[in-house]
Every structure is written in structure tokens, then in C-alpha cells.
Amino acid sequence: MISSKFGIGQQVRHKLLGYLGVIIDVDPEYSLEKPSLEEISADDSLRRSPWYYVVMEDEDGKPVHTYLAEAQLGYEISPVHPEQPKLDELSASIKKQLKTPRLRN
């Protein structure tokens, strides 16, 4: 069984680039059809670890969807980011949806 460090709705930081992001989905292992060289290293263990769909912002504040390995992400301690309030709102919205049960009918 593969366990993941991060959960859906959690804010994270890219370890190398320092970008703030919000996790919107998790795969137990790499699941895209054709990995690019930037996404997969020569070490196959990276491919077998959890991968995350993460929303980040570009320099203009527009959302950027990324697919990142668990090894590329670190915990974000601060829950509030005045420079990127949209990501704070996205994180809060996702967490609220996960806590609130939905009626199907």
C-alpha cells in the first residue's frame, strides 16, 4: 500500500522553485501516458511514489496546473498568503467541500 504525505486541499511548496501550490488530486504512482524527461528521472522509484495534481500561479496570478512527484514538494506552514489570496481561497474551498457531505438526490 502506498501512502501519501499530502492531502487534497493542502497547501504545499515546490522544494526547488519555492512556488506555493494547492493539491487538487493525488495518484498513488505516476499515471500520465508519456512521461517527459523533466517529470521522470532515471530512478524508477520516483515513478512509483505518489504524484500530485497541483494548482500554482504564474507571475500574472493566472492558475497553472502541474503534475509533481512527492519528492518535489514540501509542507507549507503558513495558512495565509496575502500575495496569493486566490490559492488560500482555493485551499479553503476544497477543504470545506471535503468536510461537507453532499446529498446525491
Curated annotation (Swiss-Prot):
One Pfam assignment: YccV-like
Locations listed in the record: Cytoplasm
GO cellular component terms given for this protein: cytoplasm
InterPro entries (UniProt xref): Hemimethylated_DNA-bd_dom, Hemimethylated_DNA-bd_sf, HspQ
One of the protein's GO biological processes: response to heat
Example GO molecular function: DNA binding
Basic residues compositional bias, start-end: 96-105
Cross-referenced SUPFAM superfamilies: YccV-like
Family note: Belongs to the HspQ family.
Protein name per UniProt: Heat shock protein HspQ
Gene assigned in the entry: hspQ
